[in-house]
Structure formats: C-alpha cells, structure tokens
Amino acid sequence: MTSKPSNDRLHSYLDLQPEVAAALSQGRPVVALESTIISHGMPYPQNVEMARGVEQIVRDNGAVPATIAVLGGRLKVGLSADELELLATDKAVQKISTRDLPVTVALGGHGATTVASTMRIAALAGIRVFATGGTGGVHRGAGETMDISADLLELARTDVCVVSAGVKSILDIGLTLEVLETQGVPAITLGADEFPAFYSRRSGFSSPLTVQTPAEAARVLKVKWDLGLTGGVLLANPVPETAEIPAEEMETHITRALADMAALGLSGKDTTPYLLGRIVELTGGRSLETNIALVRHNAAAAAQVAAEYARLG
C-alpha cells in the first residue's frame, strides 16, 4: 500500500492564507470555495464581485472563507485581493481537475479548480465543508461517450461535504444518483424530499436522503467519519424559489444547447463551459442571475454546516 504523504511534504505545496491557517489551527469553521466559476463561469467584473460577495456571506454565517486555486504552481487555500483579480482576468488560467493537478503544479502554472480538485486540496488543508454552485456528474449520452465527471470519483474517496444546488441540470441526474449510490456517497437534500436540478428546485427524482437543518447535516458528517466511512457527502441545497427557472422551461433550453454543441462537435472538458454559456444566451441572462443566487445560497448553508460541525468537536 502506498504511504500517505507527510505533513512536511504537503506543506511544501500548500499556501494557506494566514486567516485560514489560524482558523484551522484553532478548530474554527472554514468553508472551501472553488475557482472555476470565477475564471470560466462568469464574465469580468461580475466574477470578482460574485467571489467577494460569496466570501462575505461565508463570514456573515460564522465561518472563514477559503477560495482555492493553483497559482504559479502553488496550491492556494485562501486568496489575496490581487490573486483573486489575477484569477478573474488572466486568460492563461486553465480549468483543472484532479488529473491536471500534478502537471500544473510541477510546471508552475495557473489553474482554476473544479469541484474534484477543490475537494482534494481542501482535504489536504484539513477543510471539511465546501460550497459550490452545481456538482458534475454523468453526462447525457454517457453510454456512448463515457463522459462522467471526476467529481463523482472524488466524492467517493475524499472526506469533504460538498454543498451544491444538486448536479448541473445539463447532466443525466438519474444516472448520476445511481453512480453516487454505487459509490456509497450519501446524496442528501436539505429541507426537501425532491432532489434539486441546479437552476430548478425540482428534478423529478426523489432525494435518496433528507435532512431538515444544517445542524442535522453536521451530525451526519460527524457520524459518517467517526464510523470510518471514507468519502464525501453531497448536500443538495435547492435554489431559492425567487431565483429558480422552472424545470420544464430549462429542459427546452438544455435540449437546444445540446443540439448546438453536437453540431459543433465539442467533447470532453469543453462541454460544460459551452453548455452553460449557451444557456445564458438562450435564457437572456436569467440563468447567470440564477447561478449567482444559488452560489450565494449555498455559501450561507455551507457556513452554517461548518459552524455546527466545528461545535461538535
């Protein structure tokens, strides 16, 4: 069996922002935040405004924010204002998942982290709760393409709770839930019996598991990891009613975007950015507004879960 890297070896790659390092050493709640949504999910300056706003929401709900990225080959856990600006404006920043981490770090590159790579870096830093917009999953047509997000594998092996608005609605939600079940990953919806579909509160799929409060979610995390059950938890937090786009309307836009993508012959990691961008066009910008609203909503929930988890000791 391969031995785990020592703390000294990990420290040689990690840069913890002082506020984050202090919070972790004192057992205070910290919430990890991803960076792909900043560099590849929204235009400038909306991306910077959103990122700063989300960090403030985490603070307002009792936790310390730790936006994660790779800059100059360093695993950054918490970003300065200048680093956030670089991430939001530098076109050389690549979207990186776990497979890309060793190359980006070894070659001193810049990378915006996906859900999977953010989870991995958060775990290395000792952060247990992570807020994002939507989680990746099984793509539609995966029976032909085998396009399945690394997010699902990371959820199966990394001890981090991911708070999201469910899996992205451009994906095959039913098959994604099946894969999570096979991998032993609890897919839990906060305060609802139906699993959400990112832009929409309803997906048509019953939630495998449900909790009613952040405190209940925190207790689930503690028990899971106390029992030695390796792997993460997907905590689905439905988008606020005031910001949602009904599932029926979204399905029309998604079908059109998928057809346009097929005509262009896009595949691999180009698919999700294209589809999300095309849906922004098809919805006249409404989907971007919904995306921002759900990210903010998830940040608040994640901070509350992290605060409750820290109280459990």
From Swiss-Prot:
GO molecular function, one term: hydrolase activity, acting on glycosyl bonds
Residue positions binding substrate: K95, V115, S149, A150, D151
Tagged with keyword Membrane: no
EC numbers, comma separated: 4.2.1.70
UniProt-annotated binding residues for Mn(2+): D147
Root EC class: lyase
Active site as annotated: E34, K168
Record function comment: Catalyzes the reversible cleavage of pseudouridine 5'-phosphate (PsiMP) to ribose 5-phosphate and uracil. Functions biologically in the cleavage direction, as part of a pseudouridine degradation pathway.
Protein's recorded name: Pseudouridine-5'-phosphate glycosidase
